[in-house]
Amino acid sequence: MTYRSRAQLDAGLADVVHSPLDQGRLALIVRRPASGVREVLAEAVLDPTLGLVGDNWSVRPSSQTPDRSPHPDMQLNVMNARVAALVAGPPTPLGDKTAGDRAVGVYAVGNGPMADHLPIDRRTLAGDQLYLDLDLSEANLPAGTRLYLGSAIIEVTAQPHTGCGKFSARYGVDALRFVNSTSGRRLRLRGLNARVIVGGTVRVGDVVAKVG
């Protein structure tokens, strides 16, 4: 697997910064039922207590809470869909997995027997649940901003969402430096954290709009 170079990533930034400021779209939903497993969904239920229903956030210990309980401000990991597509590149055939792919055991659709015969949608390697075609920058969505998403409402939290070693293993060192750069953090290229305020159903293609 050949990772995107920094030059390719920088060239793709022009498209990213033209993401809608409002009235965006939910492009991809990914549930993580267990560590290293991804389920690409057409729709999902968001719950104020559980986050994305069926996702392992509600049972996964957090190193950022005193009692290691799930962090309430990290219920939802949200990434810009254009950034995800940029760093991921095209789907990878199963015969061309990188070590990072094998380590996480990611599937393109679901987690059933047929998944073994499907190419890997490398966007899902990021590990986020919601991928939005929306400007996620700090300037456009400061902490506390609420968004209508399907019949749910979510709120952007102040908890940082930055790239880590796993991100580097899956997308390359250049991608990690790209999202963690000064401008990358300002634009939230790695994404943002959010919590569910009003529960509801969300579907791929749903409009995402600022509340108020």
Residue ranges and their predicted role:
Residues M1-G212:
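Metal-cofactor-dependent catalytic cores
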